[in-house]
């Protein structure tokens, strides 16, 4: 097992990619704390992890609230003895709006959740990873952060910001044994993707080199790799799990 003896915190772990990430980490031996504002889903994910005979509990965590994040991380350290891996998966993606129709309150909310939330969680775990001399922070961005997205001013901006933050953390963390990387999913067959009208799903899938969406497990496998010692000399990278959507396809 790649992650035996490690303790991981996954934010946004109640459903979607965050849930699959948590399960994948547990399958490789990690104990996993599932953090979310939706406790029902977080508890369910945690129960699935416990069924794998791994230590796990769900924790209510609003990543926009610094004190709440700090308290949650302190609880993890107290109850599980360590915090080795952080997967920042909490995010909002629930609206499309061109620049003149973009609501200010949604712009501010997306900045708080997606970008400041990633900052808050990374900062909270940092002292423990620094003290131990080992840590892995994997941040979830998106190809929208590198390519832009029509009608996605707030979302693509926050994801681009996460990439910049990750590179800075990588520079600062390497001397302490803290590796920081960012995963950029493309078109993934997730719950939110399946809500899109079928004709739009088909059009988006055809933009990829594979002409089909990826699966949540494809993203989770990348995260497991980056969390492991197999990636010990990798930091500051932007890993696209995108099926080549950023390539010119025709």
Each model region followed by its residue ranges:
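Short C-terminal tail/terminal secondary-structure segment
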Residues: 96, 147, 224, 235-250
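Substrate-binding pocket helix/loop in short-chain dehydrogenase/reductase
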Residues: 97-99, 103-111, 193, 204
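Active-site helix of classical SDR
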Residues: 122, 158, 166
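Alpha-helical segment proximal to the catalytic Tyr-Lys
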Residues: 127, 171-172, 232
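Residue(s) in the substrate-gating loop at a strand-loop-helix junction
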Residues: 142
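Short, small/polar-rich loop/turn modules that mediate ligand/substrate recognition or access, typified
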Residues: 174, 179, 234-236
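C-terminal helical subdomain
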Residues: 182, 204-230, 234, 241-243
């Amino acid at each position: 097992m790649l992650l035996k003896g490690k303790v991981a915190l996954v934010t946004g772990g109640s459903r979607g990619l965050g849930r699959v990430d948590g399960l994948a980490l547990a399958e490789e031996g990690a104990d996993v704390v599932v953090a979310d504002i939706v406790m029902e889903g977080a508890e369910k994910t945690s129960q699935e992890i416990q069924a794998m005979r791994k230590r796990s509990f769900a924790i209510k965590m609003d990543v926009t609230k610094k004190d709440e994040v700090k308290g949650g991380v302190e609880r993890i350290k107290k109850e599980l003895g360590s915090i080795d891996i952080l997967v920042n998966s909490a995010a909002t993606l629930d609206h499309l709006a061109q620049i003149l129709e973009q609501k200010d309150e949604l712009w501010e909310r997306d900045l708080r959740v997606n970008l400041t939330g990633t900052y808050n969680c990374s900062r909270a775990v940092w002292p423990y990873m620094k003290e131990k001399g080992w840590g892995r922070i994997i941040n979830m961005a998106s190809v929208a952060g590198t390519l832009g997205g029509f009608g996605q001013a707030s979302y693509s901006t926050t994801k681009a910001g996460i990439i910049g933050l990750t590179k800075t953390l990588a520079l600062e963390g390497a001397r302490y044994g803290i590796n920081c990387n960012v995963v950029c999913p493309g078109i993934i067959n997730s719950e939110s993707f399946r809500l899109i009208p079928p004709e739009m799903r088909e059009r988006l899938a055809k933009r990829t080199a594979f002409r089909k969406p990826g699966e949540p497990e494809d993203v989770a496998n990348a995260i497991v790799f980056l969390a492991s010692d197999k990636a010990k000399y990798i930091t500051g990278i932007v890993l696209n799990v995108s099926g080549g959507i950023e390539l010119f396809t025709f």
